[in-house]
Amino acid sequence: MTKRRNLFMVGSSFTIDHLPPEIWLCISKLVGTSDLHNLCLINRRLYLTITSDEIWKRRCYDRWINRESLDILTGNDYDSIPVSQWYSYYLRRAKWENKIFCLLWGLTEETNPQHFREKYLHILQFRHYKLATFLHRIIKQGYIPDKRPLDLITYANYLLKNVRHKYVFPLFYPTNAAELKNLNNMASRDAEMIYLRLSAIDTSFDDLLDAREFILNGICSDLLQKYKKIEEFLKLRPVTRVSKLISISTDYLDCFTQPHDSVGQTNDRATGRELHREDFMLLRVYSREGRGYKTIILAIIQAITKRYNVDSYLARDHLVVSEPDFPDGRAFVTVNEDFQPYIFDKEDLLSVWSNNFHNAENFESTVLPALLEPISIQHLLTEFFRELLRCKPRPFEGYPNRAHGLRDMFPYGKVEVPRDVTMYFAFIYDLFDGMFESGMTSLRGQMLRDLLNYVNANNFGDLNIIIGQNALKEPNDCWSNKRDYVLLDDNNKIGYFYTDIETEDTLCALNQYEVDGKVFITTIDILGDIRVRLAEGLTPFQGDNDKLWESFSSVVPRTDWGLFFKGYDKERRRMQLNPYIEEKLSNLANDEQPLHNL
């Protein structure tokens, strides 16, 4: 007993006061708010040690940096804050985050359409990097009864779309020649960022960032098992690094497997930690095909090798790697018909391509430079639209009940790409197709106006971000008006669950009315699709409503359910109407006017 007490005597070399700050920092990361409260009551000296400025400031700094790294779009918007200044910045940031949240909460209580629009645009006036990370976190937390209602998450989702349009539009509408040149350079040097920015239009891609980081960390762990230090691996010549990284990546990515390997793939594998081609590039559902595309696979290889100091650029069909030991100082990576990447030198490249040309010398002087020219932003975008948008999103035939098939359909994401997002990309593809056919070098004139008008119809507020105030007249047909287009009649008919007799889909009623002796029910499914259906094709849900809600409560906040509902009422076993819809029904009841004229 005496020896044990002596170990912790003040002044002893073993006292806890002499533990290095790194140890206290690790301890503080494991301590939650309730733990700190209990610790304050039990051992105030230990509590003061953990919460001291020296430890707590560094903990705040580390936590914030980790949170920032989750959002790939915020990295270049402000300089990193020195540790010495971080604590005060952390406190300031918490203040304006609370302000944003108050404004967002006020948005859920607004019942006047014009005032709603004004408040929505007011939130967009915050700097985009402030909004992006905060909204990202709100959406990721999901629906929390009484704290994070459905309508709040839905509005946050639309706001985040608005913010991220700022990153998408410069890809299509560069303001000057210098900016266009920089974009082209970025396209060849870092094709991954192009795909990430394109995918930023779909906010559900946030769920894939953790899985993507898991893959990159797994590759690093495998390297550390083979090499004691990463520095040993970095000493290898670039082409060797590329080869070994491709080999290791095969264990994590499905884009390098042989075609017969994907046949008979089970759901168990689909829900594992393997990351699919579209998942890695955060474009998982724009194509339903099981094989990879050359440009995307090469961009994946480029993204992985870039982390290990491999200098490369992306050409049309090749990834060109700087390799001093090879002739001409370059090595070439391409993908064969079986989507297997392989590496070769210039001599092999000439022997393969020159067989198709009678004059080998003419090929090397004229054709080869064109083949190895860095890919331009226009060609990269065209490749993306041509390959990934020719297919519709994955069909639902194999999943009769969407509520129980979401994990099989989208093992990493939580929701299908919305129809308006698919239309957005398809619309831009048509513009690019017409642009190249007409020989135009940039989007101009009516095509640009059509594009901006289309996007603005689905996401009002974008025009102010992109090209300034009052550049185009905002149309009345925007996403917020969906709640006004749905015919509402009786509160007692809204919010109950139904099952489609034919497809077994789970639906929620938005209205019910009778026309010419037939009863119609306006429904919304768990993906936010609103349709009018015959009542004879539906049946009231017979199962456990509470379990049903739990099965898709993580999905619907990212859809348009929040335009009508704020949560689930367990006592009444139905959805709760949000303030906007309640106000609308109240006004209609007071006016006693017909709600539809069919």
From Swiss-Prot:
Pathway(s) of this molecule: Protein modification; protein ubiquitination
Chain ranges of the F-box domain: 13-59
PROSITE patterns: FBOX (PS50181)
Annotated localization: Cytoplasm; Mitochondrion
Any one GO biological process: mitochondrial fusion
Keyword Cytoplasm: yes
InterPro entries: F-box-like_dom_sf, F-box_dom
Protein name stated in the entry: Mitochondrial distribution and morphology protein 30
Organism (species): Saccharomyces cerevisiae (strain ATCC 204508 / S288c)
Lineage summary: Eukaryota, Fungi, Dikarya, Ascomycota, Saccharomycotina
